[in-house]
């Protein structure tokens, strides 16, 4: 370990060596000179001595004593009633005694006797905190000051170093030149001494050369001096610039704080100078502006006189400040009289602020007053009218006021406001009426940006892709069972009621290749689903049951396939049944223009059985053969393009869409656009629910991450960035909304009479929530078909997803019934529906929903009134009773007659009166009913012309409930 001397320790402690030696001797450490070595034990003894000397040993002693004194006093105080009461007041006083050091004890006692403050612990802590803050502030200020001083010293040192370096370089150059000259002189003398016979001319040349070199050395020294002066000049210039910048900032601050000055034009300045010249030699004293201070005027010198006096007869200038050709210029602060405010052009020239096209009669500035002006023609503008435009925008395009457009619309018989939206046809009529040329505008369509993406897909290299096969046919003909056998899975058992209510998309890997199947519903309500399936498919498998034959949905499937232009492969199912008749099926299909190959047509017919598997291989072989003929190809290494087969809203996952990729490759993370929905693919699942990273052509996948539920059948495109997708989606939403709004406004007047005639029509409001969009479309379509002239179905709202509280609130406002198709209401919605008495009905089979709605509509129909003859009565004798009228004595020939029954009077088998019985008696007693074979007396209300031989037909009207 390195030894430490007394001098080194004194240097570390910033003390003198002699003082440290004295302290060491006082501590009992014998050291005589600063060079003596100090050990660690010596340092420890010195430290103990210093602690004892400065009182640190007494730190543990108690230095502060707190004394609390309690004083009680009484005061007398009057209360609200005027009585005087004695109130005891207790005051607590706290004193803190602090034990100080001995030298300061007397001073502390004197201060305590003078002030005797009461200081508590909080006050002490606050004061200590304040002292600490002040110390930190002082330390921070000292550090900043020290840093500035160090920076200035460093800058000065650098400047001195540069100057010294320049001087050293100059000196070195001079010394080098002198040394070289001296060496050459010595060499010359040595050469002269060595050879005395050298010519004198050589010596003179050497001398001249030495002189030249001496001059060069002097020149180098001068250049070094000039460089040093240049550095110094640059430093001076930098200092001056800094001072100038500071002065400018100071001037700007003074200017900002100074009162504002009035800027005047040259015309005003000339007028004031003329007035000043007129007042010279008089006793008039110029009035100083109100806002100007005397010191400011004294400091600022007056402006110089103008270079030339104004011409004779020239105007004095506009006192109010004209807007002349020259810009504003700063005026001095000399006191000048302000101009009088006058009416008219005081300047008389063209620069006055009141000068215009209709100047005064003494005005001479307008040289073109009598010049020829060509007549103005109406400007015919070419107005580009978009699909929808507001009245204000249309007026702006024609450069007219909106009021003019509104007047023109009123002339055309339509009341509009400035913000009302007009459709394209109406707007073009208005433009033509106002004398302009209307052109249907081509919108700044963001969808035009999609052309490049589609072109990129078209230019990509195409590869062979699997065929997309759609299975179509009538309900219960075995489509799903056939596909189930091919897939080796149980799908039909999972569908409610054993019927397919969704489009199922699957791809199957067979020994002969990959095939993608689309299973479509066969029920008549799912027409839109079958149309979408035919649109996305390459080949259609038409399933016809051998025991049932061609049915309505079979014909519809044939029509869809022909409209899509895709080949058909007929699969005759259920051939294993005893009552199967494939030949009858062929004959019926021939009637529908589906000709089998054995009859000379081009449609293969394959008898199959989904139970035994008979004909399945032959069916797949025919499908792949058709695919080879079609030569199906699609680009793979390109942005994906596809079709939304089905879409739904999941409570946890959000909008979900089943997409069939038609070309390109869809990857997780791609930005997709589907109609008015857009988003980034967050997750992608195959038909088995397993995650998939990508999907090539003809592969169906389920994607998540869209902004909303897309419409089934929408085209799906992959775009390079989300901004473009959002822009196109919002454009589509706005376009559809504007067009719909404009059409609704145009159709209001046309529908008014129709709505008035429908005032007596009853309506059944419904809110429909389904699991997928295809089912929702089918259910809405089926229910709307139930509407009649008397009762119609009103679909208030139809959407995908569970039943929420907002649906219940909507049902409460519209008095609607909520139908949930494969969906359920959450707890909040159920409670709210129960409180408001809203009927929520759940279904999972479309037949049941349609039947119950049909029954409800039947109950809303007004009952049918039917007449039923109950009896026939013959008049045998007529009695005329005073105050009663004619009374007929009758015999009941058939049926019975009741009191107050409806009757028709028949005379010669012709109805002459229809009315109601007034009374019915047997003998003298009133009776309720008289049956066949008995006599009775009766009178008819408001009819006295009863004759013998008349017949009375008794009937009653019954109401019968009607059904749809």
Swiss-Prot record:
Q: Which stretches does the entry tag as region G5?
A: 609-611
GO molecular function, a single term: GTPase activity
Q: Which SUPFAM superfamilies match?
A: Initiation factor IF2/eIF5b, domain 3 (SSF52156), P-loop containing nucleoside triphosphate hydrolases (SSF52540), Putative DNA-binding domain (SSF46955), Translation proteins (SSF50447)
Organism source for this protein? Ralstonia pickettii (strain 12J)
Q: Which HAMAP family match?
A: IF_2_B
Q: Which UniProt keywords apply?
A: Cytoplasm, GTP-binding, Initiation factor, Nucleotide-binding, Protein biosynthesis
Residue spans of biased composition, Basic and acidic residues class: 123-133, 146-183, 197-253, 266-278
Family statement = Belongs to the TRAFAC class translation factor GTPase superfamily. Classic translation factor GTPase family. IF-2 subfamily.
This chain belongs to which protein, by name? Translation initiation factor IF-2
């Amino acid at each position: 370990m390195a030894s430490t001397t007394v001098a080194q320790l004194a240097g570390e402690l910033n003390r003198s060596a002699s003082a440290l030696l004295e302290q060491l001797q006082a501590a009992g450490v014998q050291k005589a000179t600063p060079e003596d070595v100090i050990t660690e034990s010596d340092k420890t003894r010195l430290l103990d001595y210093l602690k004892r000397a400065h009182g640190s040993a007494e730190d543990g002693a108690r230095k502060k004593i707190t004394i609390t004194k309690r004083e009680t006093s009484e005061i007398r105080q009057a209360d609200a009633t005027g009585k005087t009461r004695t109130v005891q007041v207790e005051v607590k006083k706290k004193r803190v005694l602090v034990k100080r050091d001995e030298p300061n004890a007397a001073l502390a006692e004197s201060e305590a006797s003078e002030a005797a403050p009461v200081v508590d612990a909080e006050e002490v802590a606050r004061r200590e905190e304040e002292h600490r803050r002040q110390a930190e502030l002082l330390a921070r200020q000292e550090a900043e000051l020290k840093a500035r001083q160090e920076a200035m010293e460093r800058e000065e040192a650098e400047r001195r170093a540069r100057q010294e370096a320049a001087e050293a370089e100059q000196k070195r150059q001079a010394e080098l030149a002198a040394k070289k000259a001296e060496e050459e002189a010595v060499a010359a003398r040595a050469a002269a001494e060595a050879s005395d016979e050298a010519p004198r001319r050589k010596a003179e040349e050497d001398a001249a050369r030495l002189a030249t070199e001496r001059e060069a050395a002097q020149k180098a020294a001068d250049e070094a001096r000039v460089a040093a002066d240049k550095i110094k000049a640059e430093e001076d210039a930098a200092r001056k610039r800094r001072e100038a910048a500071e002065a400018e900032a100071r001037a700007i601050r003074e200017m900002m704080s100074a009162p504002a000055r009035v800027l005047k034009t040259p015309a005003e300045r000339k007028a004031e100078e003329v007035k000043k010249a007129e007042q010279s030699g008089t006793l008039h004293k110029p009035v100083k502006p109100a806002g100007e201070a005397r010191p400011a005027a004294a400091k600022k010198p007056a402006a110089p006189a103008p270079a030339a006096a104004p011409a004779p007869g020239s105007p004095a200038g506009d006192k109010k400040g004209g807007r002349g050709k020259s810009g504003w210029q700063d005026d001095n602060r000399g006191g000048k009289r302000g101009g009088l405010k006058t009416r008219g052009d005081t300047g008389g020239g063209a620069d006055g602020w009141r000068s215009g096209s209709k100047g005064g009669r003494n005005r001479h500035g307008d040289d073109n007053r009598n010049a020829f002006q060509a007549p103005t023609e109406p400007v015919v503008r070419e107005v580009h009218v978009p699909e929808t435009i507001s009245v204000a925008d249309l007026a702006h395009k024609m450069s007219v006021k909106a009021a003019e457009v509104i007047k023109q619309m009123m002339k055309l018989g339509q009341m509009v406001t400035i913000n009302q939206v007009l459709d394209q046809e109406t707007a073009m009529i208005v433009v033509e009426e106002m004398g302009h040329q209307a052109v249907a505008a081509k919108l700044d369509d963001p969808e035009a940006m999609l052309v490049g993406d589609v072109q990129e897909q078209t230019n990509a290299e195409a590869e062979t892709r699997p065929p997309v096969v759609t299975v179509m046919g009538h309900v219960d003909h075995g489509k799903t069972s056939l596909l189930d056998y091919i897939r080796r899975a149980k799908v039909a058992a999972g569908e409610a009621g054993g019927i397919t209510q969704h489009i199922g998309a699957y791809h199957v890997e067979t020994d002969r290749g990959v095939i993608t199947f689309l299973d479509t519903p066969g029920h008549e309500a799912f027409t839109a689903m079958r149309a979408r399936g035919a649109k996305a498919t390459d080949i259609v498998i038409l399933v016809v049951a051998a025991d049932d034959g061609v049915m309505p949905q079979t014909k519809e499937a044939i029509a869809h396939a022909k409209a899509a232009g895709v080949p058909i492969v007929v699969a005759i199912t259920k051939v294993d049944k005893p009552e199967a008749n494939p030949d009858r099926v062929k004959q019926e299909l021939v009637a529908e223009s589906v000709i089998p190959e054995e009859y000379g047509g081009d449609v293969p017919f394959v008898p199959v059985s989904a139970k035994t598997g008979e004909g399945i291989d032959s069916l797949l072989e025919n499908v792949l053969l058709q695919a080879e003929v079609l030569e199906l190809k699609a680009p793979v290494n390109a942005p994906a393009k596809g079709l939304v087969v089905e879409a739904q809203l999941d409570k946890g996952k959000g909008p979900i869409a089943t997409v069939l990729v038609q070309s390109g490759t869809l990857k997780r993370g791609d930005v997709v656009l589907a109609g008015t929905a857009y988003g980034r693919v967050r997750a992608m699942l195959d038909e088995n629910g397993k995650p998939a990273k990508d999907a090539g052509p003809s592969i169906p996948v389920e994607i998540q991450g869209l902004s909303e539920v897309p419409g089934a059948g929408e085209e799906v495109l992959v775009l390079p960035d989300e901004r473009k997708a959002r822009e196109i989606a919002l454009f589509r939403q706005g376009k559809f909304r504007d067009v719909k709004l404009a059409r609704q406004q145009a159709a209001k007047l046309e529908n008014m009479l129709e709505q008035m005639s429908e005032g007596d029509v009853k309506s059944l409001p419904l809110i429909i929530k389904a699991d997928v969009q295809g089912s929702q479309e089918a259910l809405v379509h089926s229910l709307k078909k139930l509407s009649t002239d008397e009762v119609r179905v009103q679909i208030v709202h139809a959407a995908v997803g569970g039943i929420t509280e907002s649906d219940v609130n909507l049902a409460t406002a519209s008095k609607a019934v909520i139908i949930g198709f494969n969906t359920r209401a959450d707890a909040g919605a159920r409670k709210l529906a129960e409180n408001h008495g809203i009927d929520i009905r759940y279904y999972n089979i479309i037949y049941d929903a349609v039947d119950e709605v049909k029954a409800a509509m039947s109950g809303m129909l007004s009952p049918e009134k039917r007449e039923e003859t109950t009896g026939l009565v013959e008049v045998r004798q007529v009695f005329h009773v005073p105050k009663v009228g004619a009374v007929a004595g009758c015999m009941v020939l058939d049926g019975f007659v009741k009191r107050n029954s409806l009757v028709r009077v028949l005379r010669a088998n012709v109805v002459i009166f229809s009315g109601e019985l007034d009374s019915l008696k047997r003998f003298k007693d009133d009776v309720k009913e008289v049956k066949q074979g008995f006599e009775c007396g009766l009178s008819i209300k408001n009819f006295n012309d009863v004759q013998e031989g008349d017949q009375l037909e008794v009937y009653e009207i019954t109401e019968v409930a009607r059904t749809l």
